[in-house]
Amino acid sequence: IAAAIQGWEMRLLRGVAESALDGLFGLDRDGFAECESVDALFWIGPALTQEPSLSPRLCEGLAALPLAGAPNRLSREYRDWPELQRIHGLCRAPRLPARRWRVAPGEPSNDNPGLPLRPLLHRRRSAQRMDGRAGIDVGLLRAWLRRLLPERSPVPFAVTGEAARVDLLLFVHRVRGLVPGLYWLDRSGLRRPPMREDFLWQHVDPELPLYLLQEGDARALSAYLSCQQDIAGDGCVALAMLAHLGAALEEGPWCYPRLYWECGQVGQLLYLEAEAAGLSGTGIGCYYDPLVHELLGLTDESMASLYHFTLGRAVWDTRLCNMPAYPAMRRD
């Protein structure tokens, strides 16, 4: 998003194996108190139609550069997690074929005409509490959900060049013009696994793949599923991000962490959309994923709940002091 403001594009470079990236940036050398690794390599610059290739000579030259400075110690105490190290090794992407980078431009939107993006990026904060009273109009929710469709928002969803694999289970609490209950946003277009037979699957919007599953007050349910956190029930709407895990793993185990990347992209857009509307959002990392799967009637591991989120009017703690996120640079 920050690159797009400058007129640049950001794209994932797939032509170098992740394990080789550590050597390119010197993370495989002595002197590191903790094991560090490179997760991804990106191109940031003018728009290109095709992923550029990195020549072996360039890679060898980068790997031979001297390491400047000394690595910082990340923690006073280091705890070894061998199982996490094993999973990390299994999930590193190999060298992958290049892909075309040209994508269709996003559809223009007048949801927030004249609203500058830079201040939203600077002041974006996670809410700690929601007031439990504020509501939104259904038109605003539709605008938010339209923004989450990959074809509507190539920034940021075109960064990896991979198809969407994350759908959304919505807990609608206070949305004027939309009955409270459970909804499903089919943003990936992938085939759904069997779910509960009593779900309605009622299409509720001509412009969105949005379906009503079940009517009812879902505030207590959403709070309980998010580890009994009231913030999930006190917002206007909460959601669970469910990934098509089976389809991703068929392509390779390296797709697993990228499902979290996609959830992060969804969350970032929701943060900014909430700020633009004078509201706030917050990610919820503690939740009972087996109970979410049980709620939907999922009987296998083809889908998995990977992250939760909520949006509403924040209640700020007046004991906290706000400091500018990006203080002006000074020249002495």
What are these regions (language model features)?
Residues I1-D332:
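Acidic, surface-exposed loops and disordered segments
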